[in-house]
């Protein structure tokens, strides 16, 4: 039965840099009640605020632990913890019958991701993965162009997803235990998701990756800060993804993403985060972004599915929006193969 009353959404953790943005988006949505908890925030060595302080700064109701968060009876939860802590929160949500939107990557290990998918399926709860670039109008146009056959058969894709190293605001991104790696884990998955959507979930066949720590070497981080990943898919399609933390710290924007698809009849390139007006000020470059709020579109898609699915029923499939947990597993398989390839210096077969 669908949900007609205001929907109750929990936010589990402020560890991820996207958490505050999701919260602000939700606060502006009608028919949504919010509650957040960030129990690990007080002990995190971050310069930016977390926990009750961050919640208060954006006007977000807050409780101190996940027991109180789930006792509130949420219909849905957005999991924005450190990557290695996703599984525990998602499995608890499944046990409580709470629909889940999980930040990317789904987990740090494929076995954990598969367990999360299985737990949500058994409990009848939604498991959606936070890949907002799928909702960019530029990607929609590219997908429609490809589906219409205008590019012919795609045989090569070049993706870039570069950004600033997030060490100042959230140090765990450079901790291999909590993040699962560095730049490859952080940035390969967005382009991998777009390719997954364009190919209808085609599996990767081989992955060859190279990574190093030349960028930001002065920061003494334990994870890779630069990487290049080459993927061969079942059809023979070849894709490369530059996933480096190569955006300068002083840049006026966090970074960006590009995707160029080449087929037998032509090629199209998109740059979803390019729209802005800019200039110069006394402190340097000025950049004012505009355009579609893809985070809002992602959350809209999730909440629409939650409303239409209603309360979870064990063993009964809900309305699952895309990208779902299966997409999360497939994209993590690519990241995992890239990590292994970079370690051994050779291609890895999936």
Give the ranges of each region predicted by the language model.
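Contiguous beta-strand/loop segments that form the cofactor/metal-binding neighborhood of enzyme cores
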Residues: 5, 193-274, 299-311
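Beta-loop-alpha module in the N-terminal Rossmann-like domain of NAD(P)-dependent dehydrogenases
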Residues: 47, 57-119
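C-terminal glycine/acidic-rich active-site capping loop/insertion
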Residues: 10, 29, 52, 60, ...
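C-terminal helix-rich "cap/oligomerization" subdomain common to oxidoreductases
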Residues: 1-3, 68, 76-78, 234, ...
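Rossmann-fold dehydrogenase core element
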Residues: 115-133, 152-157
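Predominantly a Rossmann-like dinucleotide-binding segment in NAD(P)-dependent oxidoreductases
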Residues: 133-220, 345
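N-terminal Rossmann-like dinucleotide-binding module
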Residues: 1-57
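Hydrophobic residues in well-ordered beta-strands that form the structural core
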Residues: 64, 102, 127-129, 270
């Amino acid at each position: 039965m669908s949900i007609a009353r205001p929907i109750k959404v929990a936010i589990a953790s402020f560890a991820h840099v996207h958490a505050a943005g999701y919260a602000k988006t939700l606060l502006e949505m009608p028919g949504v009640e919010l509650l957040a908890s960030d129990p690990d925030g007080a002990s995190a060595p971050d310069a930016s605020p977390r926990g009750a302080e961050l919640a208060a700064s954006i006007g977000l109701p807050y409780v101190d632990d996940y027991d109180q968060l789930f006792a509130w009876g949420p219909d849905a939860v957005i999991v924005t913890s450190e990557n290695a802590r996703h599984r525990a929160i998602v499995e608890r949500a499944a046990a409580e019958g709470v629909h889940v939107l999980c930040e990317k990557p789904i987990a740090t290990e494929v076995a954990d991701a598969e367990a999360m998918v299985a737990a949500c399926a058994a409990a009848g709860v939604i498991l959606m993965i936070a890949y907002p670039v799928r909702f960019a109008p530029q990607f929609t146009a590219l997908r429609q162009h490809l589906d219409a056959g205008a590019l012919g058969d795609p045989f090569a894709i070049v993706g870039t997803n570069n950004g600033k190293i997030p060490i100042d605001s959230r140090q765990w991104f450079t901790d291999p235990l909590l993040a699962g790696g560095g730049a490859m884990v952080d940035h390969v998955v967005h382009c991998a998701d777009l390719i997954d959507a364009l190919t209808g979930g085609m599996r990767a066949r081989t992955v060859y990756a190279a990574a190093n720590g030349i960028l930001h070497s002065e920061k003494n981080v334990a994870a890779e800060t630069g990487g290049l990943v080459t993927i061969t898919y079942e059809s023979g399609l070849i894709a490369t993804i530059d996933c480096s933390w190569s955006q300068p710290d002083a840049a006026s924007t966090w970074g960006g993403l590009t995707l160029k698809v080449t087929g037998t009849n032509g090629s199209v390139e998109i740059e979803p985060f390019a729209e802005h007006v800019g200039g110069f000020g006394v402190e340097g470059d000025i950049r004012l972004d505009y355009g579609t709020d893809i985070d809002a579109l992602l959350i809209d898609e999730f909440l629409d599915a939650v409303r239409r699915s209603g309360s979870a029923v064990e063993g009964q499939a809900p309305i699952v929006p895309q990208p779902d947990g299966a997409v999360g597993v497939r994209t993590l398989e690519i990241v995992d193969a890239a990590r292994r390839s970079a370690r051994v210096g050779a291609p890895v077969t999936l």
